[in-house]
Amino acid sequence: MKILLFVTLIALAFVALCSAEGNVVVLSPDNFDTVVDGSKTVFVKFYAPWCGHCKKLAPDFEILADTFAPVSNKVVIAKVDCDQADNKALCSKYDVSGYPTLKIFDKSTTAKDYNGARSVDELLTYINNHAKTNVKVKKAPSNVVDLSPSNFDSVVLDKSKNVLVEFYAPWCGHCKKLMPDYEILGNTYANEKDVVIAKIDCDAADNKAICSKYGVTGFPTLKWFGKQSKDGEKYEQGRDLDTFINYINKQAGVNRVKGGKLAVGAGRVEQLDTIATEFIAAAAEVRKELVKKAQTVVDSLPEELRTEGSYYVKVMKTIAEKSIDFVTTEIARITKLVSGSMSGKKADEFAKKLNILESFKSK
């Protein structure tokens, strides 16, 4: 009897686990009436796995479920896969003819269609209003600088910084569409001390004079304020991430890829690459002269490149003292170090060292 009870409990636990994905409750004919019982507000997504709009909505729907999880006694975020044979009658019952279809059961077993915007903020506001709750999304720290009259000049007109500014309005559809990629852009350049990704809300009364000053008449307007010119060059290229990144890399003289890692070749200096190639093929006496030649090049480099330049010289001296095997062992050592959870400036430093060491490998 005890064994039977134990097995039954395990089975029930398994069913419970299968009825949720994260904090999104998975509905089926077996549990629909139990969940949508009129005791709480239930927001349901009727979807199909192959539907492109459904796939696009999925991450935000999970955020929505996570946000309402602390008040799950009042609000449930759920979904029904209408592509599953067992669920087709359920989807038909609620007149689902396209995907995704969103419906709210407002402490009732009667559904109301939701036809508003599908952003997290819009959905959150809608459900809060119906359920009389006041939950808020915990937003991740942003690497996009918010501008206002109090900091615009100190950030944008700083001649030591390259600054991309988005002039936007919160109600603007194109601005909303750009927002996720613009956040990724901010993350991509977070470790570049000379590059700033910023935005200013032109709908805010205090900001209108600034937006007018820079000739903003439509949204979003993007302007580049480089170190050499603070007039604000209008950005008129594509708004996809790759185009943004290529533009900023070229304008600012940096070498980032999406997400913030350094691209292959970052930290390399062409003149020193040439000397490195000569160095590995040269005899001992010639190598001494090449070290001096490399140091002369380093001394002539801009301040921001001298750390990398000095590493070329350090590698040359180490090879001269030990052997060319140093390159292989050092690459292995650094690769092992960066394979962990290293990030930020240290990760950049080691990435540049790896790139420089590649220039000493036998061609």
Curated annotation (Swiss-Prot):
Gene: pdi1
Annotated GO MF terms: protein disulfide isomerase activity
Keyword vocabulary terms for this entry: Disulfide bond, Endoplasmic reticulum, Isomerase, Redox-active center, Repeat, Signal
Top-tier EC class: isomerase
Gene Ontology biological process: protein folding
Gene3D superfamilies linked: Endoplasmic reticulum resident protein 29, C-terminal domain, Glutaredoxin
Catalytic activity entry: Catalyzes the rearrangement of -S-S- bonds in proteins
Principal subcellular localisation of the protein: endoplasmic reticulum
Cysteine disulfide partners in this protein: C51-C54, C172-C175
Compartment(s) where it occurs, according to its Swiss-Prot or TrEMBL record: Endoplasmic reticulum lumen
Protein name: Protein disulfide-isomerase 1
Active site, per annotation: C51, C54, C172, C175
First and last residue of the signal peptide: 1-20
Assigned protein family: Belongs to the protein disulfide isomerase family.
GO cellular component, one term: endoplasmic reticulum
Species: Dictyostelium discoideum (Social amoeba)
Superkingdom assignment: Eukaryota
Function field: Participates in the folding of proteins containing disulfide bonds, may be involved in glycosylation, prolyl hydroxylation and triglyceride transfer.
InterPro entries registered for this protein in UniProt: ERp29_C, ERp29_C_sf, PDI, PDI_thioredoxin-like_dom, Thioredoxin-like_sf, Thioredoxin_CS, Thioredoxin_domain
EC number: 5.3.4.1
Residue intervals of the Thioredoxin domain: 21-132, 133-285
